[in-house]
Amino acid sequence: MSNIITEITKSQLRTDLPAFRPGDTVKVHVKVVEGTRERIQLFEGVVIKRRGGGISETFTVRKISYGVGVERTFPVHTPKIANLEVVRRGKVRRAKLYYLRNLRGKAARIKEIR
């Protein structure tokens, strides 16, 4: 039984996404359905968390929109993600960057890996 589950989950995994980590600035191209139309919406921000493994793996992206922090969680292997671009590689020493929620302005910057 577990072999069947393993095979099904392996077929659902995506291999076309680039490697990214917490601290990286990414652009997520999300497919949005509005009525009968489908369009692509960009969501650019810093990856603050990556959790889980296999088919249930998720990541959270945080951005500031009009002075308000917005966080959005995406499953890594969802077909709703059309594309994912890594804009900048960030150098951080933590796996979960929850402390960024309390920082404002220049204090919330992350050093870039050269």
Swiss-Prot record:
SUPFAM superfamilies: Translation proteins SH3-like domain. Belongs to the bacterial ribosomal protein bL19 family. Pfam families: Ribosomal_L19. One of its GO terms (biological process) is translation. One of its GO terms (cellular component) is cytosolic large ribosomal subunit. GO terms for molecular function: structural constituent of ribosome. PROSITE patterns: RIBOSOMAL_L19 (PS01015). This is Large ribosomal subunit protein bL19. Keywords: Ribonucleoprotein, Ribosomal protein. This protein is located at the 30S-50S ribosomal subunit interface and may play a role in the structure and function of the aminoacyl-tRNA binding site. It comes from the Bacteria. The gene is rplS.
